[in-house]
C-alpha cells in the first residue's frame, strides 16, 4: 500500500529570523517532507536575503489592495490549488515543529481522514496551557484513532476551532471536490466549513506550536504592541528545544482520558 503524501506550505512576511527557525525545525523534525514558502512580498532586508538563500523553495506572492490580512488567504488558496499531495500542512513563519514527526504520525492522520469522511481539517497545534479548561469542556478523546473530537454545546455559534483553523492539515481532494475557496478571515472560513464539512479534529500527538513574543502584523504594518515588545526584549527568536525521541514516544503512548 502506497503511503499518502504530506507537503507543507509556509506563509511568510517580513519575519526572516522566525521563518528561518520554522524552516530549520521542519528540516530537523520532518525530513523528507516537501515544503514551499509562500512569501507575501517581504521587503525587510534580512528577510529578503534569507528568502533568496532558499531559491526555488520560495514562491513570491504579492497581495493586492488593503486587506488587513495582506494576501494570506489568497496565498493559502494558491497553495491548495498547486498542491500535488494528498494532505497539506499549513504553517505560518512564527511556528516551530517541536518534535520528531514519524511515519506513525502520518499513518494516524491518514486513518482519521479515512474513517471520518466529512473531516477535511486536522489541527497539529499544541494548545496553550491557558486554554486547558476550554479544551477539557469542549473535546472528548477518541482513543481508537488517537485524536480529540469536538463535543461542545451545539448552540455555540463560533466555528473556530470547531470547524476550521488557519493552522491545519488539509485533505486536498475533499476541499477541491467541494469547490472550496478561502474566505478573507478565519471566522469566514469557519462559517464556510460549517456549511460544507464535519468538525475539525484535534491531533492527540500535536507537533507544532507558536514561538512566544513574535512580532505581529495587521494589514502589513507592525502593531504597536509588537514594536514595544521588540524594543523591550529584542527581536531574537525565542525558540523551543525539540522534544526528544524518547519523550515523543512516551507522549504517543499516554492515556488520552487523563
Report residues per predicted region:
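Short aromatic/hydrophobic "clamp" motif used to bind/position activated sugar donors
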Residues: 88
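Short, acidic, metal-binding catalytic loop of nucleotide-sugar glycosyltransferases
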Residues: 24-33
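A recurrent flexible, glycine/aromatic-enriched loop bordering the glycosyltransferase active site
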Residues: 149-170
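N-proximal low-complexity "stem/linker" segments adjacent to membrane-targeting elements
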Residues: 1-24
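C-terminal catalytic/acceptor-binding lobe
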Residues: 164-173, 177-258
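Conserved donor-nucleotide/metal-binding helix-loop-beta segment in metal-dependent transferases, i.e.
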Residues: 100-121
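Active-site-proximal specificity loops/subdomain of glycosyltransferases
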Residues: 43-83
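Short beta-strand-to-loop element that shapes/binds the nucleotide-sugar donor at the catalytic cleft/hinge
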Residues: 117-136
Amino acid at each position: 500500500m502506497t503511503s499518502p503524501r504530506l507537503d507543507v506550505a509556509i506563509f511568510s512576511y517580513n519575519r526572516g529570523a522566525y521563518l528561518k527557525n520554522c524552516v530549520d525545525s521542519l528540516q530537523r523534525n520532518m525530513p523528507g517532507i516537501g515544503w514551499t514558502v509562500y512569501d507575501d512580498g517581504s521587503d525587510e532586508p534580512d528577510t529578503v536575503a534569507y528568502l533568496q538563500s532558499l531559491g526555488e523553495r520560495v514562491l513570491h506572492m504579492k497581495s493586492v489592495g488593503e486587506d488587513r490580512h495582506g494576501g494570506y488567504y489568497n496565498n493559502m488558496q494558491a497553495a491548495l490549488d498547486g498542491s500535488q499531495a494528498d494532505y497539506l500542512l499549513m504553517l505560518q513563519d512564527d511556528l516551530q515543529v517541536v518534535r520528531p514527526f514519524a511515519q506513525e504520525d502520518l499513518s494516524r492522520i491518514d486513518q482519521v481522514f479515512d474513517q471520518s469522511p466529512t473531516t477535511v481539517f486536522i489541527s497539529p497545534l499544541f494548545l496553550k496551557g491557558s486554554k486547558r479548561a476550554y479544551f477539557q469542556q469542549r473535546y472528548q478523546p477518541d482513543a481508537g484513532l488517537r485524536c480529540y473530537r469536538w463535543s461542545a454545546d451545539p448552540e455555540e455559534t463560533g466555528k473556530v476551532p470547531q470547524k476550521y483553523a488557519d493552522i491545519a492539515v488539509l485533505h486536498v481532494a475533499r476541499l477541491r471536490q467541494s469547490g472550496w475557496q478561502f474566505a478573507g478571515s478565519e471566522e469566514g472560513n469557519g462559517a464556510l466549513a460549517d456549511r460544507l464539512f464535519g468538525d475539525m479534529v484535534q491531533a492527540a500527538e500535536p507537533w507544532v506550536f507558536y514561538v512566544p513574543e513574535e512580532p505581529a502584523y495587521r494589514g502589513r504594518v507592525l502593531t504597536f504592541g509588537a514594536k514595544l515588545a521588540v524594543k523591550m526584549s529584542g527581536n531574537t527568536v525565542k525558540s523551543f528545544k525539540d522534544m526528544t525521541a524518547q519523550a515523543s514516544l512516551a507522549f504517543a503512548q499516554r492515556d488520552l482520558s487523563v
